[in-house]
Amino acid sequence: VGTANVTLEGITINTIHGGSKDGGVTTNTNVMLKSGKVTNVYGGGLGTSTTIAKVTQEGADVETIYGGGYAGIEFGGITTNSTINVNNSKVENVYGGNRDKGITKNATINIRGTSLITGELYGGGKRANIGRESDAGKTTINISGGTINKDIYGGSEIAAVYGTTNINIGVEAVTDDSPE
């Protein structure tokens, strides 16, 4: 699949995957969360790889956003670059990387304006690594506004980061040049 565009506007759904399911590679995903309600959002696919995954939260009721995909074989489900933008919106938990296996190479999270993160903020994935021992990755969290009610972690939850983690906090942390 070349490019997959998904927009949530005015409905309630359990899960959104930006990419493919159980086969193929999606080159680009763009998930836009405008209104409605969703439990889990994945920029990547289900058990598949995505080259560039982007999730933008602009007003939907969202429980958890993952920049990468869900599941995959030990090294399957690779997300090369993920970007999450939370713009003047509310999310419970945010993970820059994959969930439950697979690998994210590079993950960037941008929190802007009056955004509210009511739970945890992880630069990496949940039970999914950032990079590999032989191929380093990177997480970057940029916070230029908003409130994070719990903790901020540059790395992953119950997984490793092979590479670097960066957390930038302040008015100039997210600029027009930050990945979107």
PLM regions and their residue ranges:
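Surface-exposed loop/turn motifs in large extracellular/passenger domains
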Residues: 1-15, 21-40, 46-66, 70-93, ...
